[in-house]
A protein has these predicted regions:
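RecA-like P-loop NTPase motor core of helicase/translocase proteins
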Residues: 1-386
Length: 386
């Protein structure tokens, strides 16, 4: 439920003199084309990009970016008060423990007790790194139910990034190019819904003539070729060739490539591993997969969108290994995940102290959550019982 703290701070920012997007948001409301769930997600997205610098969640919470707790009226020991007033990460975790569910029940009363009584034994920065999966790149998850317009929200994020990137081309918070990955377990899913990104009308979120100018610079590539190319000596993977056609890559802006995660996953070996154990056919498959991964890693200012993150399991782990490599090779803007069900298959434990575990049942990197129940009667039909 960390997203509740993010939303609270976002709402404050939207009303503050520091907010630079009020006119843009008002324009989106006036156009009346985007759903409320999508507009709220856009507010969070731009808040994290502009006010928070697109930094990783562990860093934002450690720095106290979402803190609003008044410690002065709270009953604390002298030692706990000293730590909580000087350590922003400690105050952030305490504020999280005080959150309540929809029935008003406190989220984590035992966590509150441990923080107040054993603060001196807790490495808060380390705890936040573990809570957010130990990744050093930006990794935000937007949770919207099916039918909320997730694909058009992806398109909106793409156009908004390009809008701000054109105004501030050297600002690392905004992506210039985008890789959209369909779930690895659903081999037929690329594609028809994600192809709808191409149909999005940017005038719904950005005024003319800017919207049309942005539309002109966008170049869509659907990486769904199954066989290797025969005509090119340099690139044998036809999907890699599609990206290679946009050389010089260092000047590239506006590429939106859509593919299945299966095509980039580290399914067999890395280049450094012993290849003698594979037959020729297997080696060809490995080299073709490596080719696509390598050229994606060279795309500058890249943002990766992962659809249906909850399909996780082994495929998700392998995909994360690939993304890790991309973050090292070139300028990289981060990962955006999208899921209708942001729940873990099993409880994940994070050690707070030697005797206390934080138990997570939800994906912790959710930055925006729109529950299914809110969609029913809004944009989803109420089921009719006969």
């Amino acid at each position: 439920m960390f997203y509740k703290l993010i939303k609270k701070k976002c709402d404050e920012w939207m009303k503050s003199p520091d907010c630079t997007i009020r006119e843009l948001i008002q324009y989106i409301y006036t156009q009346n084309k985007m759903r409320d769930a999508q507009i709220e997600a856009i507010k969070i997205y731009l808040f994290l990009k502009i006010a928070c610098g697109n930094r990783p969640l562990w860093q934002l919470f450690t720095e106290g970016s979402f803190n609003s707790l008044d410690l002065t009226a709270m009953e604390l020991t002298v030692e706990a008060r000293e730590i909580l007033t000087t350590n922003k990460a400690a105050a952030a975790l305490l504020e999280y423990s005080l959150l309540t569910d929809k029935n008003g029940k406190q989220l984590a009363p035992e966590l509150e007790k441990v923080i107040k009584s054993q603060s001196e034994h807790i490495n808060y920065e380390d705890v936040f790194k573990k809570i957010f999966y130990g990744v050093n790149y930006t990794d935000y998850l937007f949770s919207l139910p099916m039918g909320a317009g997730k694909t058009y929200l992806m398109a909106a994020f793409i156009y908004l990034d390009l809008y701000f990137a054109q105004n501030e081309p050297s600002n690392p918070a905004f992506a210039h190019n985008f890789m959209v990955l369909a779930p690895s377990g659903l081999k037929s899913s690329i594609i028809p819904s994600l192809k709808n990104i191409q149909e999005f009308d940017p005038t719904w979120i950005i005024p003319e003539p800017t919207a049309s100018n942005l539309r002109r610079i966008i170049k869509f590539e659907i990486l769904d070729e199954q066989k290797s190319a025969k005509k090119s000596n340099l690139v044998r993977n036809p999907n890699a060739q599609k990206i290679n056609n946009h050389q010089p890559l260092e000047d590239l802006m506006g590429l939106v490539a859509i593919t299945n995660a299966e095509k980039v996953i580290l399914d067999r070996v890395d280049k450094d591993e012993d290849t003698k154990i594979f037959d020729k056919e297997e080696l060809v498959k490995i080299r073709i997969a490596n080719e696509l991964r390598d050229i994606i890693g060279k795309i500058p200012h890249l943002a990766v969108f992962i659809d249906e993150v909850h399909h996780a399991a082994d495929g998700e782990i392998k995909l994360r290994q690939v993304v890790e490599e991309w973050t090292k090779k070139h300028s990289f803007c981060g990962v955006l995940g999208f899921s209708g069900t942001p729940y873990l298959e099993k409880v994940e434990n994070v050690n707070l102290t030697d005797s206390f575990l934080i138990k997570n049942t939800d994906l912790s990197n959710v930055v925006y959550y729109y529950p299914l129940i809110k969609g029913i009667g809004n944009f989803l039909k109420v089921p009719e019982v006969k």
